[in-house]
Amino acid sequence: MTLLAKRQERSIVPRMYYITTAIDYTNGPPHIGHAYEKVLADVLARWHRMKGEEVYFLTGVDQHGQKVQQTAEKLGITPQEHVNNITGQFLALWDRLGISNDGWASTTDPRHKACVQKILTDLKDKGQLYKKSYKGFYSVRQEQFLTDKERDAEGNFGPEWGEVVELEEENWYFRLTDHVEWMKQFVEKSSDFVLPSFRKTEVLNAIDFDSDLCISRPKSRLSWGIEF
């Protein structure tokens, strides 16, 4: 009887379910794509709550970056004023759509800044960050350096990359290539980590990195970010 009671107790313990969305970029106002993602996440959160599971649904905004800085300059206002305005539009839309998120994250939040700085400091202390100079082509729209993989058959960068400029600068890099093998093994061995399962190959290809990740920008080019 005692064993049966314990099994019954374990069976009614609610399952924890965590849902997070992309954090929306605040260089411009929300559009249908933003709403589509949040509504899907909200449906998922409500469904798991109906099943009696404990849900934490997190969404938010990315308020830093070169595009935000450039947009604010064009409008003649500060980046903070610009992101405050755009963030207000996102929040108003989620309220109108009845999005039932439990948490809200913004990259200008002091808690977020402190967390990022702590993580980067720990990674640096563990030898996972290093500085190097790099010369290459940079997409202003996507805020990333491009490689030959991003060129089309004619050797050009497609319109999806927007303005592409050639840059040479020193930045901090994360040793992402050190982690490729264990990430691939984790995805391959986990039966329910990627759903639907037919997307597993796509995920494995996406994490098959052949270069480390650039994680910083020089202050001379970008002043609106988290200092490291």
PLM-predicted stretches and their roles:
Residues 14-59, 111-115, 165-228:
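Structured secondary-structure scaffolds
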Residues 2-5:
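Ala/Thr-enriched low-complexity intrinsically disordered regions
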Residues 13-130:
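N-terminal Rossmann-like or analogous alpha/beta NTP/dinucleotide-binding catalytic cores
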Residues 7-10:
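Basic polycationic patches enriched in arginine
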Residues 32, 69-70, 149-151, 225-227:
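Short, solvent-exposed loop/turn and secondary-structure capping segments
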Residues 126-180:
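Cys/His-rich short segments
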Residues 68, 139, 146, 158, ...:
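Short clusters of hydrophobic/aromatic residues that line enzyme substrate/ligand-binding pockets
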Residues 97-106, 124-137, 149-151, 166-167, ...:
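Short secondary-structure capping/junction motifs at helix and strand boundaries
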